Amino acid sequence: EYKEFFVPSHDGTEVPMNVYYKKGMNIDLNRKNRVLLEGYGAYGLNLSQGFNIVKTSAMERGWVIADAFVRGGGEKGIEWHDQGKMHNKPNSFLDFVACAEYLIAKRITHPNLLAAKGTSAGGTLVA
């Protein structure tokens, strides 16, 4: 199952975030969910949404997976990409932080249960 959220970032821009979890799992308001937050936000490329055995296995073990589509990526077109590159790159980082804070504020997880992942250029989001 999944839920789609639009997270307000530092400048009011709404950042799309999809949250995936095992069917039948209640993720609302318990703050006990282990969450893996992933982002990329670079080169105008989309965060991969294809089948991923690691994410699937994690969900089967009770993890919640959150994909943050931060500025710099290609999920919302060229303007979205431009808003997260070069002198606008801080928007990518601030979008990712906003998504993490949102998951905590909405009581989906607790700071001690939140992990972050970014590969390749997405690693700068979590460094």
Q: Which sequence ranges carry the predicted segments?
A:
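Cap/lid segment of the alpha/beta-hydrolase catalytic domain
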Residues: 1-119, 125
